[in-house]
Swiss-Prot record:
<dbReference type="InterPro" id="IPR019818">
    <property type="entry name" value="IsoCit/isopropylmalate_DH_CS"/>
</dbReference>
<keyword id="KW-0963">Cytoplasm</keyword>
<protein>
    <recommendedName>
        <fullName>3-isopropylmalate dehydrogenase</fullName>
        <ecNumber>1.1.1.85</ecNumber>
    </recommendedName>
</protein>
<dbReference type="GO" id="GO:0000287">
    <property type="term" value="F:magnesium ion binding"/>
</dbReference>
<keyword id="KW-0100">Branched-chain amino acid biosynthesis</keyword>
<keyword id="KW-0464">Manganese</keyword>
<dbReference type="Pfam" id="PF00180">
    <property type="entry name" value="Iso_dh"/>
</dbReference>
<feature type="binding site">
    <location>
        <position position="99"/>
    </location>
    <ligand>
        <name>substrate</name>
    </ligand>
</feature>
<dbReference type="GO" id="GO:0003862">
    <property type="term" value="F:3-isopropylmalate dehydrogenase activity"/>
</dbReference>
<dbReference type="InterPro" id="IPR024084">
    <property type="entry name" value="IsoPropMal-DH-like_dom"/>
</dbReference>
<dbReference type="InterPro" id="IPR004429">
    <property type="entry name" value="Isopropylmalate_DH"/>
</dbReference>
<keyword id="KW-0520">NAD</keyword>
<feature type="binding site">
    <location>
        <position position="109"/>
    </location>
    <ligand>
        <name>substrate</name>
    </ligand>
</feature>
<keyword id="KW-0028">Amino-acid biosynthesis</keyword>
<keyword id="KW-0560">Oxidoreductase</keyword>
<feature type="binding site">
    <location>
        <begin position="285"/>
        <end position="297"/>
    </location>
    <ligand>
        <name>NAD(+)</name>
    </ligand>
</feature>
<keyword id="KW-0479">Metal-binding</keyword>
Length: 366
């Protein structure tokens, strides 16, 4: 009996619906050409949900996600909802509750410098020409963003604010296992990021990561202090395979990795739990300034579908096909405005059409 692949589709706000339309083109190719039993159902989330239902994450949307095997997420937020109380705004009202409800403890951000796009990188050509293929594995539900106590104190003599970095053993163990398991599917290198020369939580982090590493004899483990890591990523990003990071350090370094690729419109991401249920989304935001102009880059969303095939559905060959189609499209010189070095570029829908056609032709030849 063929397996069903149920996907909850949440286009959201801004450019979300536009790039999601291009994602549907890829899913239709997978259904028609590979006979995958992919079923999609669309739900409101973010600002559009606030306008319709008064909340960013309606019960119907949450139930739809529960009934699915994975979530394909567009983008949320925009100026229209910025004046709402912070807990009601699209990001805090939808994305954070989804992460919490499904226990999405790991965030995977993929950063690549694609062949032919080296000049887009802010790095010197002698560095960018060496390439970059970094998978940043960030712990997502612990650390200083969630530790207690936190707050502020006001007095006549001295005002202060404070946060607490707390990591439990099980939190470090599960994200370490995730990083090492992923490294086995790549180049078998893990670089763990900490500040173990100063922070107790980082000393604890390093101790546990070292212990977990003994279960993965094929994977080479190294450690870097976060300040040195930030420098090394700029000096020679090609040396890295998998970065294993705490919540705070991963938040910072994943954005640094994104910057060196030249465009955030190329960067997919995944947030996973221990059952391989995942939320897949482009790394960029809702870009309300270009909403409706048909100029957004859909590649990050399309590559997010590839990550879904790889990590939630374990369809590795399908994921490779999607990656190949995107690579081929870029090698042929097709560009959206954000990655074009001149005035020659194609729009959102054309980019989706071309990638879908190249994917279909590739499948036909197999």
């Amino acid at each position: 009996m063929k397996r069903n692949y149920k996907i909850a589709v949440l286009p959201g706000d801004g450019i979300g619906p536009e790039i999601m339309r291009e994602g549907y083109k890829i899913l239709r190719i997978l259904k028609s050409k590979l006979s995958l039993n992919i079923m999609t159902q669309e739900f409101d989330v973010g600002g559009v949900a606030i306008d319709k239902y008064g909340v960013a994450l309606p019960k119907k949307t949450l139930q739809g996600c529960r009934d699915s095997h994975a979530i394909l997420f567009g983008s949320i937020g925009g100026p229209k909802w910025e004046d709402l109380p912070s807990h009601l705004q699209p990001e805090r009202g939808a994305l954070l509750p989804l992460r919490k409800y499904f226990n999405l403890f790991s965030n995977l951000r993929l950063a690549r410098i694609y062949s032919g796009l080296e000049k887009l990188s802010p790095l010197k050509s002698r560095i960018s020409n060496l390439g970059c293929d970094i998978l940043c594995v960030r712990e997502l539900t612990g650390g200083i963003y969630f530790g207690d106590p936190k707050g502020s104190k006001v007095s006549k003599s001295l005002n202060c604010a404070f946060d607490t970095e707390v990591y439990y053993q099980f939190e470090i163990e599960r994200i370490a296992h995730m990083a090492f398991d992923l490294a086995l599917t790549r180049r078998c290198k893990v670089t763990s990021i900490d500040k173990a020369n100063v922070l107790e939580s980082s000393m604890f982090w390093r101790k546990i990561v070292n212990r977990i590493s003994t279960q993965y004899s094929q994977v080479k483990l190294s450690h870097l202090y976060v300040d040195n890591a930030a420098m090394q990523i700029i000096k020679n990003p090609s040396q890295f395979d998998v970065l294993l990071c705490s919540n705070l350090f991963g938040d910072i370094l994943s954005d640094e990795c994104a910057a060196i690729t030249g465009s955030i419109g190329l960067l997919p991401s995944a947030s996973l739990n221990d059952k391989n249920f995942g939320l897949y989304e482009p790394a960029g935001g809702s870009a309300p300034d270009i909403k409706g102009k048909n100029i957004a880059n859909p590649i990050a969303l399309i590559l997010s579908i590839g990550m879904m095939m790889r990590y939630s559905f374990k369809l590795y060959d399908v994921a490779d096909l999607i990656d190949w189609a995107v690579n081929k499209t870029l090698k042929l010189g097709y560009r959206t405005q954000d990655i074009s070095e001149n005035n020659k570029f194609i729009n959102t829908s054309s980019m989706g059409d071309i990638i879908a056609e190249i994917l279909a032709n590739r499948i036909h030849k197999i």
